[in-house]
Structure formats: C-alpha cells, structure tokens
Amino acid sequence: MYEEPLLLLRQEVQEPGIYSAIIEAIAGGATRSNEISTKIDEEPAKCLKYIKILCELGILYKEVPFGEKQTSRKTIYGISDFMFRFWYRYVFTNRSLIETGAQDAILKKRIQPTYSDYMGLVFEKICSDYLMLQNIRGNLPILFTKIGRWWGSDSASHSQAEIDIVANEGKDYLICECKWRNEKLDLSVLKGLKEKADAFMKKRNNTWYVLFSKSGFTDAVTNEAQNDDHIILVDLHDIINLK
C-alpha cells in the first residue's frame, strides 16, 4: 500500500515523475491547468497533454460548472481515484517523516488539522451517489437528467460562490449543500444556499434545497423543513441506512 500509487503510475506511463508532480500539485490545491503548470514549472501546453492522459487513465477527472460547455474557461481538474488523492495529500508529501517512524506526529500535526477539509469532497461524492440512487428509485421531487457542481460569480455579494450539487429536470432544480463537520448544520447554511442558488440562476420554476449533514441539524433547521416541503434534510444515518 505504501508504494502502490507510484507502482501503478510506473506501469501506465513512461515519465512517471512529471505525472506524479501533476497529481501532487492537484492534491495540494492547484486545480486549473495554468495553476498546475506553474506549480510544476512546466509549459502549459505540455502540462495539459499529460493531464489529459491522466484523465484517460481514470486517475484525474475534468469538471466544468453545471450547465456550461466542456470548453468552459472555468474548467478544473481533480483526482478521481480516492486512494491516489489520500496518498498524494498525506503520504507522498510526508514520506521522509514516515520513514523515520513519525507516524503519530504526522497524524496529529499534518492529517487531523486538515482531515475535515479533505473529507468534504469525499462526502460530496457520497451525497451525489445517494441522490443518483434515490433518483433511480423515483424517491425525489424531480427525476433529474443532469447532476454536477457549480461555481461562479455572485453579483450580489461581489464574490465567488460554489454549490456542492446541482441537479435538474427542465427548470426544476435540486440545490444541495454538503457539510462534513462536527457541528449541527444551522439556518445560516440554508440562508447561504438560497443566496447561492440565486447567483447560479434566478429563473427557476421550482427549487428544492437539500441539506446533507454529517452531524445532523439544529432544531431551527428541523422546524423550517417541517414547515416547508421544499427543504429536504439528509443526515449520515439516512445515507448509511439507504438500502
């Protein structure tokens, strides 16, 4: 397991060093092709060629904001293989320390402080899979035909906004927020999600707000959902017990 990602990479490509550097850059937070090429000090065109190969191998994925063309200038890249993602985030960068036996210190100082952030994207994937299964079973308010993430500018707040999951059937939408944290999800998250939904698209027929939370919801959120059937709450228990 310790060397497996590198061994797999060496089996698939002829220049594992540059491919490994690209994956490491993405694991470290560089997601746009120009950011990645700058991080690894490689020509943008050459770097993009290597990125496309990693996408073809299923190690990376290409993503554009929901509703935009595949040629969008907002394209980002991520690590689709979760073993590669964890290994390059926490193992590869700490190899010298691991080899000195400092595993406990690495866990305390390098992994635990950032693990909730790391799990955020993993939880989004779990929530997306949950929605797709419920969609197949006809258990959602809409039968969506498309699902993805959205990010872009919020003209009202003059800032960048991101929606974890968007799914639609025509002009009817599911707008979703996924929270992997130890605190219960509160009303401020719901309010923020509604604001981001307007930044994404103001002209919608019907919108259901789906809140996913690792640690449940405050009473205020629960009461809000009981009085509004366009608010759907899903906690970790619901996901784990889905059959």
What annotation goes with each model-predicted range?
Residues 75-243:
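A cross-kingdom feature that marks ATP-driven nucleic-acid transaction machinery
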Residues 1-84, 88:
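Interdomain hinge/linker elements that couple catalytic modules in large macromolecular machines
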